[in-house]
Amino acid sequence: MLGKIKYIIKHYYLTIINIPHFIKNQILEFRNYINDCKYKFSHLAETNYQLGFDHLYKGNLNDALLRFKLVNKFFNSNDSKVYYQLGLIYYLKNNYRQATVYLEKSNEKYKTIFINFLKNYQFITEIPQEIWAQYRDLIAQYYPTIFNNEKNIHLPYRFVNETLKHISDLSDNYSILELGSNIGLVGYEVQKRFPESFTLTGVEISSFMNEIQATFYQNTKIYNHIYNIAIDEFLKQNSNKFDIILSFCGLSFTNNLIKYFNLIYSCIKKQGYFALCLPNSVKTQFSAKRKEFIFNLNEVNNFLQKNNFTILTSDEIILAENNKYSIIVCKKIT
């Protein structure tokens, strides 16, 4: 009996003296649990942010919106980068008011330029370079689908083929400049169809379009030279003259075409050619839905003639009821 009592006393004594160690271990376990939860939450935030980013660049706007809103609500509230991405999404979804709301909450580099553009887009004559470059970055991966149509008209091919029809007397080793070379849609057709031999130079403001060109055209070198720069900056700095200048929807960031036609004219050799494709409309104006200017064909022709170009052909191509383009080929006679 006495032995049993001693055992019980010893048991409780050991239990009591171990309580501090027990409490300490429990605290450590709880701290580890909290740290683990923090890591997982941080990881979830990063994962959802990256998924949102991927969806945004693939054009899956609703999925991108969901991911960034999850990050904003549950993980990183009031995050400047998240607000900026939400602003971009609403811009692409044509909700300019909501885009402005989120951009105003951000502190990113082009915030002020973007907000000013969104509030005054009805009055602009040119899309700011920073916005145009970012927009083309965002649409780069699905850019070819913009020209999809039920008529199976391959617009880049149509543009190159129409240009080639009206070009003659090319010198050996002639030079071609493409303004707004995108992911290489037109450059690829030029390499396939234009007679050898020539050098092809591309100018594209979107760094991402230049970067993913190799993804679309693997093992194919399209351009001899490519410049990641705004078109007007290139034309002002350029000292070379080209036999042919092409622009496939590369000038739709501006309605001040006279300015650009004048710069282009000075960069073309005598008897050289200028071919362009532009989105068409009854009235020249900025399209909030398309994020670019759309042009009246007669006005464009008049601007070309005022800049001393001789128009060889000027046609409207109808892909769909509200998706029309003009293809114009002209020549510098003097």
Swiss-Prot record:
Pfam families: Methyltransf_23. This is Uncharacterized protein RP092. Gene3D superfamilies: Tetratricopeptide repeat domain, Vaccinia Virus protein VP39. InterPro entries: SAM-dependent_MTases_sf, TPR-like_helical_dom_sf.
